[in-house]
Amino acid sequence: MIDKIKKGYSLRELADYLDESDAIPKRGYKWHIASILVILKNPVLYGGFRWAGEILEGAFEGYISKKEFEQLQKMLHDRQNFKRRETSSIFIFQAKILCPNCGSRLTCERSIYFRKKDNKNVESNHYRCQHAP
């Protein structure tokens, strides 16, 4: 996998290559980009491992050196094709307000209904917790 990435394969091309090879993924179906990324970002590649939220290094011999691992991570990061989505949200507190009961982020909801007494469409915007009954 590492050699293919260094040769310029995209994650999709690598997944297709692995599907055509004899390498069988853990669940036995097709290779997914997410599972390939988990493997390529795992510190086990250079001999480290995660324990209680910390990365312990030098526990065993890795497949590549730590320097090569860091170069691989930079390469993967530089190849990412993510762009910030521009939003024209009317919810100014979106993802900023927390539920006072459970601490999860409040979601935004918008409803439009027709009010008969003055024959108008009324827009109602509000925030609610997904975990509230």
From Swiss-Prot:
Transmembrane segments: none annotated. Residues 1-82 bind DNA. Signal peptide: none annotated. InterPro entries: DNA_bind_recomb_sf (IPR038109), DNA_bind_recombinase_dom (IPR011109), SSR_resolvase (IPR050639). Gene3D superfamilies: Putative Large Serine Recombinase, Chain B, Domain 2 (3.90.1750.20). GO terms for molecular function: DNA binding; DNA strand exchange activity. It comes from the Viruses. Pfam families: Recombinase. PANTHER family: DNA-INVERTASE FROM LAMBDOID PROPHAGE (PTHR30461), SITE-SPECIFIC RECOMBINASE RESOLVASE FAMILY (PTHR30461:SF19). This is Uncharacterized immunity region protein 5. It comes from Bacillus phage phi105.
